[in-house]
C-alpha cells in the first residue's frame, strides 16, 4: 500500500545517473557530507539524543517495577506517557515551524533538553527522587525530541540538495548505531539504582546543549538554505 501510494502521488524531481560506480559514489557522498560544517552540526544534534532515550527505554521497566514498585500493567500506562509526549511535541512543532526559523527551534529544543537533563543529573547525584520527578523529565526529554530532531535534520540536509537521499541514510545509520550503543551501555551499567538508570540520558542532554552553544565554532556564520530548485536536475 505504501509503495502504491508513493508511485501514485510522489513526483520524482531528480534524474538518476549511472556515470559513477556505486562505491565511488558513496565515498564521494560521504566526503561531500562531512565537508559542510553545517551538516556536521546538524548531525551531532540528531544522533546524540537517541542514546539518551534508548538508554531509558532499555532500563525503564526495571526501574519502574523494581525500584518504584509499580505493576507491569501500570508500567505500560506510564511508558505510554513518553510516547504521548513525542506526539504532543510533534503537534507543537508543526505550529512552531510556521513562525520561527530552524535555528531558533533548535535553540528551543536545546534549552528544553538542558532543563530536563540538568534535573536528571541532580537526580543521579542524589540517587533518589520521587517517581513523578524522574518521569516528568523523561517525558520532557521525549517532548523535545520531536522538535529538535526534525529541525536539525533540515539544517543538516540544507547544504546537500543533490545527495539528500544518501545524506539522510548516513544520518539514520549513525543515529541507529548511537541509539543502540546507548541502550547496550545502559543495560550493562544498570545495577538497580536510580543513578545508573538516568545518568546516560542526563549526560547526553547536557552534551547536546553544549554542542548548541558551540555552534559558532562548529558551523560559524549564517546557516545555508538552498531553494527547492537546486534539488531539481
Question: Model-found features: residue ranges?
Answer:
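Pair of pore-lining "gating" transmembrane helices in MFS-fold secondary transporters
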Residues: 35-55, 139-140
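Short amphipathic helix-loop junctions that connect adjacent transmembrane helices
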Residues: 58-74
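A late C-terminal transmembrane helix in Major Facilitator Superfamily
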Residues: 143, 153-192, 200-201
Amino acid at each position: 500500500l505504501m509503495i502504491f501510494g508513493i508511485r501514485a502521488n510522489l513526483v520524482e524531481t531528480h534524474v538518476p545517473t549511472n556515470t559513477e560506480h556505486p562505491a565511488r559514489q558513496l565515498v564521494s557522498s560521504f566526503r561531500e557530507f562531512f565537508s559542510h560544517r553545517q551538516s556536521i552540526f546538524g548531525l551531532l544534534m540528531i544522533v546524540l539524543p537517541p542514546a539518551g532515550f534508548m538508554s531509558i527505554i532499555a532500563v525503564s521497566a526495571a526501574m519502574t517495577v523494581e525500584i518504584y514498585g509499580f505493576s507491569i500493567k501500570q508500567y505500560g500506562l506510564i511508558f505510554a506517557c513518553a510516547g504521548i509526549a513525542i506526539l504532543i511535541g510533534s503537534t507543537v512543532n508543526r505550529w512552531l515551524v510556521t513562525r520561527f526559523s530552524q535555528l531558533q527551534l533548535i535553540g528551543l529544543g536545546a534549552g528544553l533538553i538542558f532543563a530536563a537533563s540538568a534535573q536528571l543529573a541532580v537526580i543521579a547525584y542524589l540517587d533518589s527522587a520521587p517517581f513523578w520527578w524522574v518521569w516528568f523529565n523523561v517525558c520532557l526529554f521525549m517532548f523535545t525530541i520531536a522538535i529538535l530532531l526534525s529541525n536539525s535534520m533540515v539544517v543538516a540536509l540544507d547544504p546537500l540538495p543533490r545527495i539528500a537521499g544518501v545524506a539522510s541514510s548516513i544520518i539514520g545509520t549513525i543515529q541507529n548505531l548511537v541509539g543502540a550503543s546507548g541502550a547496550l551501555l545502559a543495560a550493562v551499567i544498570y545495577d538497580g539504582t536510580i543513578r545508573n538508570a538516568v545518568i546516560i540520558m542526563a549526560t547526553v542532554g547536557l552534551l547536546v546543549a553544549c554542542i548548541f552553544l558551540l555552534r559558532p565554532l562548529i558551523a560559524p556564520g549564517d546557516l545555508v538554505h538552498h531553494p527547492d530548485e537546486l534539488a531539481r536536475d
